[in-house]
Swiss-Prot record:
Alphabetized GO MF terms: ATP binding; phosphoribosylaminoimidazolesuccinocarboxamide synthase activity
Reactions catalysed according to its record: 5-amino-1-(5-phospho-D-ribosyl)imidazole-4-carboxylate + L-aspartate + ATP = (2S)-2-[5-amino-1-(5-phospho-beta-D-ribosyl)imidazole-4-carboxamido]succinate + ADP + phosphate + 2 H(+)
Pfam families from the UniProt entry: SAICAR_synt
Enzyme class: ligase
Entry EC no(s): 6.3.2.6
Protein name per UniProt: Phosphoribosylaminoimidazole-succinocarboxamide synthase
Entry similarity comment: Belongs to the SAICAR synthetase family.
Pathway where this protein functions: Purine metabolism; IMP biosynthesis via de novo pathway; 5-amino-1-(5-phospho-D-ribosyl)imidazole-4-carboxamide from 5-amino-1-(5-phospho-D-ribosyl)imidazole-4-carboxylate: step 1/2
Gene: purC
PANTHER family attached to this UniProt entry: MULTIFUNCTIONAL PROTEIN ADE2, SI:DKEY-6E2.2
InterPro entries: SAICAR_synt/ADE2_N, SAICAR_synt_PurC, SAICAR_synth, SAICAR_synthetase, SAICAR_synthetase_CS
HAMAP family noted in UniProt: SAICAR_synth (MF_00137)
Keywords per UniProt: ATP-binding, Ligase, Nucleotide-binding, Purine biosynthesis
Cellular component aspect of the GO annotation: cytosol
Length: 236
């Protein structure tokens, strides 16, 4: 597989074209950002940890019947993925109250949500990824009603699979965001799944083991990521 021009540079990953029109290379960088890119720092080993963590999770999801864009690891910081036509919407599943939900509704952090909630946000950094609903997605042509049904179904399936995976490792899956795209007519899970895009707390102590350590200045960010990976059995 030949790596070609950079197609897109995000806050923490770069996307490259390949000699296959249906495949891209994702490069996980050490860049770490918060507050819609207003704060950016370099954290050693982060690209490697997130790349291998993502590969591990995506393979677990594939085994459970969730179609993903992941194909294979190419090295410490790179993986080969399917080229998706991305839907510009983030799907957020919450099992416990945290983050923007606490700020938006004024509820106490850590409350268990039964049932788990499912929310949609428009991917737009300039607007701060605003909270939207299903009718917005269809009315503005960001996706179809049928695609939304499939995205919700897959999001809840991901939650079912990963909640158990993390629980077995002594961790609470507090919440997470997912992005989806279309590959040859099929809705497929895209982007990544890593501690950058989810909240993970130690089940006993409620210690934060995710990107909130960076957002809130708690320190030991990568050490926490590596601890999560170790508990799951991710080969780093």
């Amino acid at each position: 597989m030949e790596k070609r021009d950079e197609l897109y540079r995000g806050k923490a990953k770069s996307v490259y074209k390949t000699d296959d029109a249906d495949r891209l290379i994702l490069l996980f960088r050490n860049d770490t950002s918060a507050f819609d890119g207003k704060r950016i720092e370099q954290l050693d080993r982060k690209g490697m940890v997130n790349n291998k963590f993502n590969a591990f999770i995506m393979q677990k999801l594939e085994e459970a019947g969730v179609p993903t864009q992941f194909d294979k690891l190419l090295g410490d910081n790179e993986c080969l993925v399917k080229k998706l036509d991305m839907i510009p919407v983030e799907c957020v599943v919450r099992n416990y109250a945290a983050g923007s939900l606490v700020k938006r509704l004024g509820v106490e952090e850590g409350i268990k949500l039964e049932p788990s909630t499912f929310e949609l946000f428009l991917k737009n950094d300039e607007k701060g990824d605003p909270f939207i609903n299903e009718s917005h997605v269809v009315a503005f042509g960001w996706g179809t009603a049928e695609q939304l049904v499939e995205m919700k179904k897959l999001s809840l399936k991901v939650n079912e699979v990963l909640s158990k995976l993390f629980d077995d490792a002594g961790l609470l899956l507090v919440d997470f965001k997912l992005e989806f795209g279309v590959f040859h007519g099929q809705i497929v899970l895209g982007d990544e799944f890593s501690p950058d895009g989810c909240r993970l707390w130690d089940k006993e102590t409620r210690k934060k083991m995710d990107k909130d350590r960076f957002r809130q200045g708690l320190g030991d960010v990568i050490e926490a990521y590596e601890e999560v990976a170790k508990r799951l059995g991710v080969p780093l």
